[in-house]
Amino acid sequence: MRTLYLHIGFHKTGSSSLQLALHRCRAALLDRGVEFAALGKKGNSSGAIDVEARDTGLHFHLNDRFRQLLAATRSDTVIVSAEHFSFLYRPVDIERVRDICAEHFDRTVVVAYLRRQDLHARSFKQQGARGCERGRSSSSKLLGHEAGALPQLTPAVRTYYDYFSKLRQWEASFGRDALQVREFRPARLQGGDIVTDFASLLGDGLDIPPCRVNEGVGRREFLLTHKLIELGAAPGDIRRLKPGMRGDSSRVTPGRDNARAFFEAFAESNRQLSERYLQHESGLAFSDDFSTYPETGNDLLSCADLAEWSADLLGSGIENPRGLRDALLDDCIRSLLEDPVAAGTLSQGVAGELQGIRQCLARTAAIAPARTPWWSRLRRKKRSGR
């Protein structure tokens, strides 16, 4: 009997670490009769899912590479890991996954690791700050680049983080017994890490040495990258600014109330998730303790930040760095004036002075437009992968 272990993510739950560990041990695994099949060089098979941003929203499609990958396997026990499977939510797409698996395997085990929504979104949005342009990464397409450590609750974001509804669709196609649902938290993982935990599902005493892939970004890179992309800065300019952003080891964090509100947006889904797949004493599948968050977040770009970072910006070699700095400064003041809480503390005179500063900055603030070289139009549009 042939068995497929299909690891579907989610994103930001140690998937890269698991994939790299499996990739490094693929020869030893094969000696034990376990085949790790992958599309990517580091073990990620997310290239089997196309992710497209259209005017009507995000669209996810299983492409032919998944069938080709499974068809090339030979062992009785096979592992495939692709966190982009966690994007799928339409019954027709998940049924297609099931049908392709059934062509080659007698049994499929679907493995999903979940993370509390606010913690997940904070980490996933960091991934979008590693790039230099809108729409190149799955994080950019799903979460966007608006200000704040957490994304806006768009329909696509609500769909992605409705874990219960999504898992019900996987159950409808594969059956409840086929699902292995785990919380991505050291205290609830075998051995305290995802690699050891996943190996325990395979049985036979398999030992896979853990590894850790750290993909976090510092606060400076997070705030500046997201803001520059939001303002439409040229990707080449952002790329030249990156070295100056990376000297900051601090991490961006939302305020406690904002994090709790994001989590509570999925309260009903989490109650059902706790009842059926991921029981927790809180009744919400995850801990409802938010004490690790500060009362006030550090996830908004401030004038003080720009004063501290201006030297690196001005010396970056980009076109018109002063114009870019002034555009960032103008945006900071605009945000301050439009914030109902902050604006309520400003006297009429101070608000007027800030408006005057904006008028002065309007004469110098400038974002250099992106220039698209002719050869870039020949590049195949990125639809899958990270």
Language model segments and positions:
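Anion-recognition interface
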Residues: 1-371, 375-378, 385
